[in-house]
Amino acid sequence: MAHIIDGKKIAELTRADIAARVAAFHKDNGILPGLAVVIVGENPASKVYVRNKKKASEDVGMYSLVCEMPESTTQEELMAKLAELKSDEKIHGILVQLPLPKHLDEEEVLKFIPPEKDVDAFHAENTGHIMIGDYQFLPCTPAGVMTMLEHENIEIAGKNCVVIGRSNIVGKPMAMLLLHANGTVTICHSRTKNLAEVTKSADILVVAIGKARFVTGDMIKPGAVVIDVGMNRDENGKLCGDVDFESAEKIAGAITPVPGGVGPMTITTLLENTLRAAQMAVSKK
């Protein structure tokens, strides 16, 4: 049976360290790192995520602001709110909760957030820095995965690393971070042929496709490390990942559960990025 990688426990340890550094930053500078989260509409899942982000930031001693805007918000109104946050010196990190309602231009919104306040690391400038390995912020989920691997003393250098999923938010940056850690990286997607053959070559398998229990135990190399980024509801409404945990657990050497795996680490990286943004802002004064 696989070793269970407890993301919740790792997140608690990491957040305790962040809280200590936030306190030291406040003592030295007389200000708190500030995070603003903008949410448009009434998406229930988004509301839960925003509530969790607010609580987590306040728990480590940060200043937290949630800007709730109605579903009918226009592009101009949203951009005006972002402009206000952009010039607010109390706010060091700005996050727009995705997805946005369909009538809003997500790309324009993400481009408008200044790179130095882009704590989700979605701005093209920040993604470019990730490509060359010279970054100020890391995308929250991939960086959270890297922290987990480091905490578990899982060697990446020289290992076959397979990432299923090529999104800009998880798949692509995840592959780049594994590459920077000297892994031999393969990215798989919907057009990949003989997927199971590729996944069975992986020493480290990261799955981020948004399909409930898509990867089964017979697709996994015995002893592999399996990181499940997925967050889905099955036909019974139960929370589950992209990996069929029951069959995978019997084959893998280590595996992240859903819930309690990658999710807590994503928010932890957001806190880390917000503190870094505040430190950068102070150093520029």
Predicted features, each with a name:
Residues 98, 209, 229-230:
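Glycine-rich, N-terminal phosphate-binding loop of Rossmann-like dinucleotide-binding domains
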Residues 106-123, 127, 230-281:
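Rossmann-fold NAD(P)-binding glycine/threonine-rich loop
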